[in-house]
Regions:
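C-terminal GPI-anchoring signal of eukaryotic secretory precursors
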Residues: 437-448
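Compositionally biased, low-complexity segments
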Residues: 9, 20, 439, 458-464
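A recurrent domain-boundary module in secreted/ectodomain proteins
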Residues: 394-436, 459
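Basic polycationic patches enriched in arginine
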Residues: 3, 426-430, 439-441, 455, ...
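N-terminal signal peptide
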Residues: 18-36
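Classical eukaryotic N-terminal signal peptides for Sec-dependent ER targeting/secretion
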Residues: 1-16
Length: 470
């Protein structure tokens, strides 16, 4: 017959249990903190915050191709290499596609029909980002026809009998098409990762959701159509995932609304968006701009492009602070790399200017607190070169500029840069175990948990034995 332990033993056992649970939670929390640098990212005024209020700044990159590459297990090494290089250079944010609408390599081949191999590719991307301490900004569709986008949604609707839809911009006001888009949003956000077992909407690796890459609307230059669409879709995303941040995906073009600095638009043209009004919409947590002076001002001289860069950046920083009170990210920036050393020097000069503007704002407490260059590639990916690529191992000067900027932002974060680098390196060395189906699980905190459990059992037995003869 078992006898009850004395009160002291019971209390001691309870304390042990509490300590054990606390230690287990600490291990889990440590893993979540490493997932991207500090758990789920939130917003406090013009700051991004983690860990209950610590400010975080972002040194990032674009790599739209991650899911596509990872959908083929034989090519997943390129994804791992990209994250490894990013982490080694202090990058902590990656912007990539969570869509591929129709076409030859679709994620969504038709409305509501998904390719599991492609989805597992996205699963792998998220798992690898987590392993290397990189946050992800996931974009949900495209304004342009690359990888489907608006045009593919319209084609699906027309194929279903909705022949009244003729233009790509009908995407923004068609009830049918908006239903297709919402279904995609729900499918992606509620997806359970086959490598981590965590639903996307619950994964702290994900920094946020971008409604569309570079929304534009020629059919309505005033911006009203895009505005209404964002006002509907941002709250819809929030209704499924109330934890992660949401942004519209704008390039920063001004419209015809109040406080819009429309004279700053390239060539003074309207693009059907309103930088200020759209970023004021409910459910939109932060503002974005893109920066391509050599493309937007094609044929202009270096001096004119430099003046545009300064005015564009400064205007958006001031307007974000004055009218939005939200953080601002440059989610794309780049300069086309022509052949020759001279142009590479110009590209690196542009890179330094953008990064300096980000740092100057962040260091002064301004709203511009991060950016992501277009685009990161690995060696041997020549077919994806677009003239904007940065391959860190082969461009030492660009790599040095990026690393220096990342270090500066990490120091603003109040982080020990070398300790952060070592922690990310240790985490990256943890393997993802893949079973015969191609699915996997990260080793994560399992070893630490087992050690804690064994220690708990041993200690509990030793405490119990002290009173076994009472």
């Amino acid at each position: 017959m078992l006898r009850p332990l004395p009160a002291f033993a019971t209390t001691t056992s309870l304390v042990v249990v509490v300590l054990f649970l606390a230690a287990s939670a600490a291990v889990q929390a440590g893993d979540e903190a490493d997932a991207g640098g500090g758990g789920v990212v939130g917003v406090d005024g013009t700051r991004f915050v983690v860990d209950g209020g610590r400010t975080i700044y972002f040194s990032g990159f674009n790599a739209y191709w991650l899911m596509l590459m990872a959908s083929d297990p034989a090519r997943r090494g390129k994804v791992t290499a990209a994250f490894r290089q990013a982490a080694a250079h202090g990058l902590n944010l990656a912007r990539t596609w969570a869509f591929s609408d129709g076409g030859d390599r679709p994620l969504q081949s038709s409305p509501g029909v998904y390719d599991e191999a492609m989805f597992q590719g996205l699963d792998f991307v998220i798992a690898e980002a987590r392993r290397h301490g990189v946050y992800l900004l996931l974009c949900l569709t495209n304004n342009f026809h690359d990888f489907g986008g608006k045009r593919q949604y319209i084609r699906w609707a027309r194929d279903a009998g909705h022949r009244d839809l003729a233009a790509d911009d009908d995407f923004f006001n068609s009830t049918v098409v908006k239903g297709y888009y919402k279904n995609h949003v729900k499918t992606v956000l509620t997806r359970v990762n086959t490598f981590t077992g965590v639903a996307y909407k619950d994964d702290p690796t994900i920094f946020g959701w971008e409604l569309m890459n570079e929304p534009r609307c020629d059919a309505d230059p005033t911006g009203a159509m895009v505005q209404a669409w964002v006002e509907e879709m941002a709250p819809y995303v929030k209704s499924i995932d109330g934890e992660h941040l949401v942004t519209a995906g704008l390039e920063g073009f001004y419209g015809d609304g109040a406080h819009e600095s429309k004279d700053l638009n390239p060539w003074g043209i309207y693009y059907g968006t309103n930088f200020i009004a759209t970023h004021r919409a409910a459910g939109v947590d932060f503002a974005t701009i893109h920066l391509y002076p050599d493309v937007w001002l094609w044929g202009s001289g270096a001096g004119e492009q430099l003046a545009f860069f300064k005015n564009w950046t400064q205007s958006h920083v001031e307007d974000t602070e004055r009218y939005l009170g939200k953080p601002l990210l440059v989610t794309e920036y780049g300069k086309f790399l022509w052949e020759g050393v001279a142009n590479r020097t110009q590209r690196n000069y542009f890179l330094g200017m953008v990064l300096d503007s980000i740092y100057d704002s962040a260091a002064a407490g301004g709203p511009l607190v991060g950016g992501a260059f277009w685009q990161l590639l690995d060696d041997g990916m020549d077919t994806l070169r677009d003239g904007y690529e940065i391959i860190l191992p082969e461009d030492r000067r660009a790599a040095s500029i990026i690393s220096s900027h990342s270090r500066q932002l990490a120091e603003l974060n109040g982080q020990d840069v070398e300790a952060l680098r070592r922690r990310r390196s240790r985490r990256a060395n943890r393997k993802i175990h893949v079973d015969g189906s191609g699915r996997g699980r990260s080793s994560s905190h399992t070893p630490q948990f087992k050690i804690l459990l064994l220690r708990f059992i041993a200690f509990f037995r030793s405490v119990s034995s002290l009173f076994s003869g009472v």
